[in-house]
UniProtKB/Swiss-Prot annotation:
Entry GO CC: cytoplasm
Keywords, in A-Z order: ATP-binding, Cell cycle, Cell division, Cell shape, Cell wall biogenesis/degradation, Cytoplasm, Ligase, Magnesium, Nucleotide-binding, Peptidoglycan synthesis
Protein name, as recorded: UDP-N-acetylmuramoyl-L-alanyl-D-glutamate--2,6-diaminopimelate ligase
Main location, first listed in the record: cytoplasm
Residues annotated for ATP binding in this entry: 114-120
EC numbers for this chain: 6.3.2.13
Location relative to the cell: Cytoplasm
Motif (Meso-diaminopimelate recognition motif): 413-416
SUPFAM superfamilies (alphabetical): MurD-like peptide ligases, catalytic domain, MurD-like peptide ligases, peptide-binding domain, MurE/MurF N-terminal domain
Family indicated by similarity: Belongs to the MurCDEF family. MurE subfamily.
Pathway: Cell wall biogenesis; peptidoglycan biosynthesis
Length: 492
């Protein structure tokens, strides 16, 4: 699907390997360059990396790859070896993969894409694979690294050179498996070019990022690229999702050598959920699969998490792990941070912090909590919408909150460069009788915790694991989990 560069041996640039690359890394950020590193300079979304070649050279770059668009000229005063490459922006990942010796070829590499569920599935796959004897690296929204020791990241899917540098480091640290969240932006901007995916999961397609993609058709087309990836062996598709069902059928026709596994509650699913129960203690489900039938009971919440478990079962069994072992380890997994994260204090309301920031995700989170809500109790929803993003999503979020919750508190999310009150005003037409409107998110959370009855449930939606709030381009320290903890502590 993607063109490949001339082998580096033919260009005179040595291919690095785990044996000879000590300390020599590739970077597309000049600030990360250290003595002996390689700088990759190409136009970006916000800045032109070629403008930072002098800084990279000053920091000790030993070699520079630069985007040759026919207009840019190398300055001979930059006295380091270099090579211009046409269309480097889209080829940088493949270049970096070759320089590092195609390290992803030596990993069981699993990609997860879809609007919702990427983080949970990726984190669960990593936990499960570790319990099955692997050493699993994670690349995703919550962070990059190994389970329990993730380093914060700014993008769900990093820049192409950064992806390959991460994989190189993971291999040096003994990784045998990598699980990656693959965003639509990452696919569209060629960030995963050069990655050798073995297996891929499609979770669902619901409204998000239309400020970027324009239409749902374009959004879906970008997501589907992952399943036509060169060398992909397994495609795991949610057929409870309308687009997923269409994609699964298309792949079976288009890719005869690709093993396609469908999952869900649907009778047509290969990995089918045939029994499901939910309580405040968690969920239990029976799965019918090509590898046999089995039950899994977990502390996770939500019907959608039974679907996510089915995706994990399909991918792990397709990769050769026995079904009984897979079910055993999945019963032990812990939720990803900020994903249906429950904070319980005796005699106080149950508070659930979740990353739900799309109408579909909010609807499902609220439906899950309605199922376990005590009789006579109220379900609260505290939410906002992000600034400088799809405005059309805002009333849809409001409608989802009104439909699913008994009491709605409208507040801010990450307003970014917008006025928080303008964002709230876009939401309010869909929320005719809010319990509270409070632009200060911390105050809104405290209000819900203080006013809710002891047996009520409160969903704090939108930010999940995030430890900042983006206001006027500045990321201020802010954590829903911390604010909830403080509010519960001081609740009378």
């Amino acid at each position: 699907m993607f063109s490949k560069l001339t082998p580096l041996a033919e260009t005179g640039i040595p291919t690095l390997s785990c044996a000879n690359a000590a300390g020599r890394l590739l970077h597309s950020d000049s600030r990360q360059i250290k003595q002996g590193d390689i700088f990759v300079a190409c136009p970006g979304e916000y800045a032109d990396g070629r403008s930072y070649i002098p800084a990279a050279v000053a920091n000790g770059a030993a070699f520079v790859f630069w985007d040759d668009d026919g207009k840019f000229a190398w300055n001979p005063e930059w006295k380091v070896p270099n090579q211009g490459i046409k269309d480097l922006k889209h080829r940088a990942g493949i270049l970096a993969a070759q320089v590092y010796g195609n390290v992803s070829d030596g990993l069981k590499f699993w990609g997860v894409t879809g609007t919702n569920g990427k983080t949970s599935i990726t984190q669960w796959l990593a936990q499960a694979a570790d319990l099955l004897g692997e050493k699993t690296a994670i690349v995703g929204t919550v962070g990059n690294g190994f389970w329990g020791a993730l380093e914060e990241t700014t993008h769900t899917t990093p820049a192409p050179v950064d992806v390959q540098t991460l994989l190189y480091r993971f291999r040096q640290q003994g990784a045998t498996v990598a699980a990656m969240e693959v965003s639509s932006h990452g696919l569209d901007q060629s960030r995963v070019n050069g990655v050798s995916f073995r297996s891929a999961i499609f979770t669902n397609l619901t409204r998000d990022h239309l400020d970027y993609h324009g239409t749902m058709e374009a959004y879906g087309a970008i997501k589907s690229r992952l399943f036509y990836w060169h060398g992909l062996k397994h495609a795991v598709i949610n057929v409870d999702d309308e687009y997923g069902a269409e994609l699964a059928g298309r792949l079976k026709k288009d890719c005869p050598d690709l093993a396609v596994y469908s999952y869900g509650f649907s009778e047509q699913a290969d990995i089918r959920i045939i029994d499901f129960t939910a309580s405040s203690d968690g969920i239990a489900a029976v799965f019918q699969t090509p590898w046999g039938e089995g039950k899994c009971r977990t502390r996770l919440l939500g019907r959608f998490n039974a679907q996510n478990l089915a995706a994990c079962i399909a991918l792990l069994c397709a990769n050769g792990y026995p079904l009984d072992n897979v079910l055993d380890v999945l019963a032990k997994i812990r939720p990803a941070s900020g994903r249906m994260d429950c904070i319980m204090n005796s005699g106080k309301p149950l508070v659930v912090v979740d990353y739900a920031h799309t109408p579909d995700a909010l609807e499902k989170a609220l439906a899950t909590l309605q199922e376990i809500k005590p009789q006579g109790a109220a379900l609260w929803c505290v939410f906002g919408c992000g600034g400088n993003r799809d405005r059309g999503k805002r009333p849809l979020m409001g409608a989802a909150a009104v439909q699913g919750a008994d009491k709605v508190v409208v507040t801010s999310d990450n307003p970014r460069l917008e006025n928080p009150h303008d964002i709230i005003n876009d939401i309010l037409p869909a929320v005719p009788a809010p319990e509270c409107v409070e632009a200060d998110r911390a105050a809104a959370i405290r209000y819900a915790v203080e006013q809710a009855a002891a047996n009520d449930i409160i969903l704090i939606a939108g930010k999940g694991h995030e430890n900042y709030q983006d206001v006027q381009g500045v990321k201020h320290r802010f954590s829903d989990l911390e604010i909830v903890g403080q509010a519960l502590l001081t609740r009378k």
